[in-house]
């Protein structure tokens, strides 16, 4: 099993590219798609009906550990369900490394996750890291200002609290992750501040699967 992760900031267009790939390769039984389990996150609600994703964006200090553990477990669960499949390529929308190097690390650095919480999180990460190593990362790099405008335009539930400053921080941690991971695996960076056509998506798909089979 080879895992290829589509990476990018919130609003970078990674989900759009992921959907394009999913449709483009829909008839290939050897390619499996695992999107970011947002629907699972949105299903976890308090007694007032507010989901954990919305609560996290509103109060990251209070909900950082709960959210990151939940995100890790849901990603891990999806991977485990297909782990017995042989000779397949798995395309994921973000991955366990994204959670670790970007979101958990950023929350810890900002003192929104305590030392004990971060150590517990790292125990979870290292326990399963070897089991689900990523073969390649495909990073869609987009200016945070453009990401911010896209987020406002799409008005997705739970995202109304996302600030430009948060997106700028996310970009920095994405870049740091790619720098670290590029020393271990194949990492491709695509700059996508322009409108992307279907022909460009097809070219990206060629790059994505180069030497994977």
Language model regions located:
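Hydrophobic anchor at the beta1->P-loop junction of P-loop NTPases
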Residues: 6
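P-loop (Walker A) phosphate-binding loop of NTP-binding proteins
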Residues: 9
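Conserved lysine of the Walker
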Residues: 14
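Conserved nucleotide-sensing/catalytic segment adjacent to the nucleotide-binding pocket
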Residues: 47-89, 108-112
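NTP-dependent small-molecule kinase module
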Residues: 148-213
């Amino acid at each position: 099993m080879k895992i290829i992760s589509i990476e990018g900031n919130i609003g970078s267009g990674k989900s759009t590219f992921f959907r394009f790939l999913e449709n483009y390769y829909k008839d290939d039984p050897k390619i499996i798609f695992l999107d970011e389990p947002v629907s699972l996150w949105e299903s976890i609600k308090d007694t007032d009906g507010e989901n954990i994703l919305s609560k996290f964006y509103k109060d990251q200090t209070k909900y950082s550990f709960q959210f990151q553990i939940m995100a890790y477990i849901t990603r891990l669960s999806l991977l485990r369900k297909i782990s017995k499949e042989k000779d397949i390529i798995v395309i994921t929308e973000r991955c366990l490394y994204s959670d670790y190097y970007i979101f958990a690390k950023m929350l810890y650095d900002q003192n929104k996750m305590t030392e004990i919480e971060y150590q517990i999180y790292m125990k979870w990460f290292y326990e399963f890291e070897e089991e689900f190593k990523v073969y390649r990362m495909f990073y869609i790099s987009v200016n945070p200002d453009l990401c911010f405008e896209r987020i406002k335009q799409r008005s997705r539930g739970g995202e109304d609290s996302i600030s430009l400053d948060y997106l700028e921080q996310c970009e920095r941690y994405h870049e740091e992750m790619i720098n670290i991971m590029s020393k271990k695996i194949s990492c491709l960076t695509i700059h996508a501040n322009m409108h992307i056509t279907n022909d460009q998506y097809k070219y990206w798909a060629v790059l994505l699967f180069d030497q994977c089979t």
